[in-house]
């Protein structure tokens, strides 16, 4: 596997810009968050359907883009999907158009026709979360918030049932490690509110829910101040590093300039692999199993993103389904072994070229794929050692029987799981030392988004809020940052 870069990219022949522009509804527009799609895959998709590519920083900008008919296809978090569906802006997903096959008697046979059929493509967690949203969107990636820290282990953060309130207290108790701008957080009002609400409920010992129950400025302010009440404020930590660009935070955690960060698990994994600038990091600061730690709290906000289609652009119905298939579903009904096939001649210095689009996208984005053949704990490529099927090195002069014999031998060998192979490639090593193996274990553990049976997933997913709630949430966030962070 080649080094994966998340630098912003430009592709020949593909028009891209940031934010909303005056796009005609006759233009096919794909909109997404930055660095949230493989450049190689986007190039492949554009070859089939010419398009304009736009980016946006928040779901709120996305909602506006659908309402004013700017976007054809976009990536949206679950609450934005619900809100857009309620407003009548979404075209239903026609699952039959993807021509994916259901598994029957151990083989792929009947075509998937609807959301109920489609559930077999995804992990159990996706089925628990998505519900009726599968009528309106195709799952893209799954994430939850985690805490990353560098250096020696903090004993309070060891164990299975660590809470966010425990993490906040540990940060304050070890402020010599995190003060002076060395604790990083995402500058996103809704995400930080959801986290604050988790802390709020944990402290009050009430049922955890990330969603607001009130709508006043005072209500939102009180929830945000749950952080300050536990000591997470300027008075204790001097200053905090709050930034809206997750890539900056990833790279700062990877090189050790920031000693702690509250990020999504996919970003934590990418930081563990060295981020964008791995080759520039001093060897002593490179992440390893002893100096890079990821804490997955018992209750934590979960985000499931979907690909959706604009109801106002039915003339792009077929092209929209084709794009979604390439980005999220191509290879979804294949075996794990098939999914790993690459074409070395078509790859670049930054990306391997995978035959199937869903694998291409996962290998670049590195967030939790909803697909069973990638993320299932027993059969998915992230956790499973797969049979090695590559026989390209067989010498042409060999007899057919010799080739078949050698092929059979190759098929009996085992190939590393995805992240072991990735780290070996980054280290340019045939094997991993103990620290590297510990880091792989940390990454694979972080990749799993597991909740206890008594925890309701629905309470950890952000739901639509009213315009008044959105306005007061944003104003309260700005006020809280100014006063405390």
Swiss-Prot record:
Residue ranges under compositional bias (Low complexity)? Answer: 393-406
InterPro entries per the UniProt record, alphabetical = Uncharacterised_lipoprot_MG045
Q: Where is this region: Disordered?
A: 393-416
Keywords linked to the UniProt accession:
Cell membrane, Lipoprotein, Membrane, Palmitate, Signal
Membrane topology (UniProt): Lipid-anchor
Quote a single Gene Ontology cellular component term. Answer: plasma membrane
List where in the cell it is found: Cell membrane
Has UniProt tagged this entry with the keyword Lipoprotein?
A: yes
The stretch of residues making up the signal peptide is 1-22
Reading the lineage from the top rank, the first entry is: Bacteria
Record lipid sites (S-diacylglycerol cysteine) = 23
Q: Where is the lipid attached (N-palmitoyl cysteine)?
A: 23
Which Pfam families does this chain map to? Lipoprotein_8
UniProt protein name: Uncharacterized lipoprotein MG045 homolog
